[in-house]
Curated annotation (Swiss-Prot):
Family: Belongs to the GHMP kinase family.
Gene, per the UniProt record: fkp
Protein name per its UniProtKB record: L-fucokinase/L-fucose-1-P guanylyltransferase
Record text on subunit structure and interactions: Homotetramer.
Disulfide bonds: none
Region (Fucose-1-phosphate guanylyltransferase) residue spans: 25-191
Length: 949
């Protein structure tokens, strides 16, 4: 998916180097010099320039349909946000959200905008190849996006207060046909909107437009002068947009014929970053979106919430009076005096005595190899107007007054005087000392002769010239140097900073690239989750450095295990023989299929975010496939047998019992289960000298026999549910009185003991019967709330035969997959956290579809689950599995490999019973290997059962 950016001309050449992105995926240009094209003409220019570079001999139409593209308009003079005019508003650094995990310390408006646009384009129908958006907004969507209809033009809008809509475009739809655009308005008055509301609904245009290839070609045609290749001014919104709809405001035969769909952005939020004031107000709004202290990791309380400092060194204390403050890429020395309503950008390291009046901003721009341009301005300055007009202000006062206070006349100025943006008034100096003196004179000390003399002898630049000539590499280098110091400070002050909620994978790359020492080990009294993050960050830094990282990584997993074990460390067990000498306890369980939300149950993600999973318990070929038999034996030892593996082991000592970490051992699970039941010293309420002594006190030895009538690596939660079945049978045998919830919680701990990791959904999925939505809150005590769902879609004759389960004969062990994904969870990887958040929301959609009894929607959502699993782990769908799917996918509504994927079983939702017959025939005749076969699945209405002989 290619990104096309329209940028300030000075940024175009250095963008790829500064942002460290490749040129193939990112195309940049600027509007032609001296031409105003509007957003429509600018879109045409951007597409034409990209086509000229990448067409490779194809026609424009062929090139257009070749791939999807995101166009971002981020050029312009940025008169109302001068502090970020040289580097473009789209690259404005944005502070990490105090309530969000997985963000980057170096994030900017572009990196925050892009994920939503990419998500929209991934959902767009095949004929929609072009998305157009603005570069000075940040748009969030808190809910899953709806499906995107087939149309020539698709626009997103927001339900907003009418007063806000008066500043933007508005989509009006007849109340009788809300899905159709009736017409569009540009910046309507409140009176117009009030009149309109009687018959119409209106959405505010948020500037996200998707165009079909036909719509693009018409837009480009309208952007050119008639019978000419020369572009003219044509606005996407006020020209093209007003010609759209059933009753368009502009008559245009071709544009009028385009079909239009208007979509409300689900859970949409709109933050504008177009002006200096909005820079602060929008950042404040997004930071204050969440007040729930449980979601805010750090313990820092700012003197004033409207106070943002990043990539900076501040040597003065900040207080509540310093409201509406933005300091970025700057050094504020100990002799500075600041007030409120400031934006301070680009200030190099200094030792100035500088007083900044309230409402005044300071911008320093590197020019050439050594020069600095001093640009003070007012927070409300708009950088337009004739210099003699009293409404034209600099530093918040009329420009003429600013001049007269400093004993300057208009003859001291060079260049135009009809537009403040074009007047050369800002001096360039070559030393930090001179920079401080001239700023004092320009800001608050107009009588400072030394400062005036520097101004008079300096070369001067206009705002336009500053943007055109700024040395952006120096600007970025200074920012990076400040950020190096910030990384160190954030790590040291982790309790009061956002450090351990950042994307630590990104942090590790920065630490290595910048040559920073890795953070020190956290003390034992630090928060457990912070210690886990700390260890995994250290491991990632060592790995990137090519050093041995495994001890640090293992320490992170050990801390996670310890945190989960803490939950039962004070609930030690005293097992008592609770059967007759000739009795056998028989436990059996179904397996589970995860329909949506799998992975969100896995620690540590579930511990800091909670999880949502929809799954169902199933029996195979008419029986629960996991069975455990426990009976007393005369000798005081433990006998372990596996029917399916044909193995046996006798355990006589505590050491032998606690040797359960060996992956692949047939008896790891029963050893760990018996340990948890109180037969190991760590979990026993009574101390014994030996296992034999304990068993004598118990009254018998123990014989445990396992039967797993299902292949390993099946993806049906076999190991977890087998563990629960063993725990459940031992619980009954030993009179421990655990309920099903306790059994499942101890299974989670058992898996940590085995070092295989894993979440809670497998055991709850099998132990609890039927179809259910399982949900947990954040915290180490993961005890899901269970909501049982109707089983109509799985048991009704119309649908029962449409659920197919096919054993592929391909196996894959989940441990390696788990370790990789869990490591990413430890590191707050933004890619993984975003996917997991989508999965969590997706589980609620699945829950809704099952409750509504919508079979088609259910099948579609199963398919979406599969797409999410593939995005999370590329190894989920190996070629051998894809080959099987290719044979039958046209007959399904959805399909997935349960569990971690990569092999095991393939679950399919056939479109109808006839399609199910066809699928059975195809796969029976084209079996990929001798082990592949269909297995009959039925919904389990009992879950885990235990009985006695």
């Amino acid at each position: 998916m290619q990104k096309l950016l329209s940028l300030p001309s000075n940024l175009v050449q250095s963008f790829h180097e500064l942002e460290r992105v490749n040129r193939t995926d990112w195309f940049c240009t600027s509007d032609p010099v001296g031409k105003k094209l509007g957003s429509g003409g600018g879109t045409s220019w951007l597409l034409e320039e990209c086509y000229n570079e990448y067409s490779d001999g194809a026609t424009f139409g062929e090139w257009l349909e070749k791939e999807k593209r995101i166009l971002l308009h981020a050029g312009g003079q940025s008169r109302r946000l001068p502090g970020y005019a040289p580097s473009g508003k789209i690259l404005t650094p944005v502070p990490v959200f105090r309530w969000e995990r997985g963000q980057h310390l170096g994030q900017n408006l572009l990196s925050l905008q892009l994920p939503l646009y990419e998500k929209i384009m991934s959902l767009a129908p095949d004929k929609l190849h072009t998305l157009i958006a603005s570069g000075d907004v940040y748009i969030r969507s808190e809910k899953p996006l709806q499906s995107i209809p087939e149309a020539d033009v698709v626009c997103y809008g927001l339900w907003v207060d009418p007063s806000l809509a008066t500043h933007h475009g508005v989509f009006a739809s007849d109340r009788k046909h809300p899905e159709q655009l009736d017409f569009m308005l540009q910046k309507p008055s409140l009176a117009e909107l009030e009149s309109l509301s009687k018959t119409h609904l209106f959405l505010m245009d948020i500037g996200i437009w998707l165009l079909s290839d036909r719509a693009v070609e018409i837009l480009m045609k309208r952007s050119h002068k008639e019978s000419s290749e020369e572009l003219k001014y044509y606005d996407l919104y006020s020209d093209f947009g007003l010609a759209l709809g059933t009753h368009p405001r502009i008559e245009d035969e071709e544009v009028n014929t385009l079909s239009v769909a208007i979509l409300p952005l689900p859970g949409g939020e709109f933050y504008h970053y177009g002006t200096s004031k909005e820079l602060i107000s929008s950042t404040l709004s997004v930071q204050n979106k969440v007040y729930d202290q449980r979601r805010i990791m750090h313990r820092k309380v700012k003197p004033n919430p409207a106070m943002f400092v990043q990539n900076a060194v501040v040597r003065i204390p900040l207080c509540a009076e310093n409201a509406d403050l933005w300091i970025e890429n700057s050094h504020i020395g100990p002799k500075w005096k600041i007030a409120s309503r400031h934006i301070i950008t680009g200030v190099p390291e200094n030792d100035w005595s500088l007083a900044v009046p309230a409402g005044v901003c300071v911008d320093v721009v590197p020019m050439g190899d050594k020069g600095f341009v001093a640009r003070p301005y007012g927070l409300d300055d708009v950088f337009k107007g004739d210099l003699r007009d009293s409404k034209t202000t600099l530093t918040g006062i009329p420009f003429g007054e600013w001049m007269s206070k400093r004993g300057l006349s208009y003859t001291d100025l060079k260049g135009r005087t009809d537009d403040l943006q074009a007047v050369s008034v800002f001096p360039m100096v070559n030393s930090v000392e001179e920079l401080g003196l001239v700023l004092r004179w320009m800001l608050s000390e107009p009588e400072l002769e030394e400062g005036k003399n520097i101004w008079l002898r300096s070369e001067h630049f206009s705002a336009d010239e500053i943007s055109a000539g700024a040395n952006l590499k120096r600007l970025y280098a200074q920012r990076e140097e400040f950020r190096k110091g910030n990384w160190k400070a954030l790590a040291v002050n982790h309790e009061k900073s956002v450090f351990y909620q950042l994307d630590l994978a990104d942090a590790a790359e920065d630490f290595v690239r910048l040559g920073l020492d890795m953070p020190e080990l956290l003390p034992e009294d630090a928060l457990q989750m912070s210690r886990i993050h700390n260890r995994m960050l250290r491991a990632r830094i060592l790995k990137l450095d090519g050093k041995d990282y495994r001890p640090e990584e293992q320490a992170a997993f050990d801390l996670l295990r310890d945190g989960l074990l803490d939950g039962i460390s004070n609930r030690k067990s005293t097992p008592k023989l609770d059967v007759y000498s000739d009795q056998i306890v028989w436990g059996r369980s179904p397996v589970r299929i995860d329909m949506a939300g799998g992975w969100t149950d896995t620690p540590p993600y579930s511990l800091y975010s909670g999880g949502n999973v929809v799954n169902l318990a199933i029996e195979l070929n008419g029986q629960p496939p996991l069975q455990v038999y426990v009976k007393p034996c005369k000798d005081f030892h433990i006998v372990l047998r596996s029917i399916d593996m044909g193995a046996m082991e006798i355990v006589s000592t505590f050491d032998e019992l606690q040797d359960y970490k060996k992956i692949g051992s047939p008896f790891s699970i029963p050893k760990a289960a018996l340990s948890l039941a109180g037969f190991a010293p760590a979990f026993s309420a009574v101390s014994y000298a030996s296992l034999e002594e304990q068993l004598k006190d118990f009254g018998a030895g123990i014989e445990v026999t396992l039967l797993a009538a299902i292949p390993a690596g099946s993806g049906l939660g076999t190991s977890s549910i087998l563990a629960s079945t063993v725990l459940g049978a031992i619980n009954d045998f030993c009179g421990l009185a655990w309920d099903k919830n306790e059994i499942c919680q101890r299974t989670l701990v058992l898996e940590q003991l085995l070092t295989t990791g894993g979440g809670w959904q497998d055991q709850y999925g099998g132990v609890l019967q039927g179809v259910k939505l399982l949900q947990t809150e954040a915290g180490f005590a993961q005890s899901p709330l269970v909501r049982w769902l109707p089983d109509h879609l799985f048991t009704h004759p119309e649908y029962k035969d449409c659920h197919l389960l096919y054993y592929t004969g391909i196996t894959r062990t989940a441990k390696g997959i788990l370790a990789e994904i869990v490591s990413s969870m430890f590191l707050n990887s933004s890619l993984h956290l975003n996917l997991l958040s989508e999965m969590k929301a997706h589980a609620l959609d699945m829950n809704e579809a099952i409750q509504r009894g919508s079979f088609v929607e259910f099948g579609r959502l199963v398919g979406k689950t599969w797409e999410q699993n593939k995005a999370l782990d590329s190894g989920t769908n190996p070629p051998a599995v894809e080959a099987i799917i290719d044979l039958i996918k046209d007959y399904t509504l959805g399909y997935k490999l349960p569990g971690a994927g990569g092999g095991g079983y393939l679950y399919m939702v056939a479109k109808d019973p006839q399609a199910a017959v066809r699928i059975r025939k195809i796969l029976t005749e084209n079996a990929p290997n001798p082990r592949a076969r269909f297995v009959e699945m039925t919904l389990s209405d009992k879950g885990f059962q235990v009985s006695r002989s």
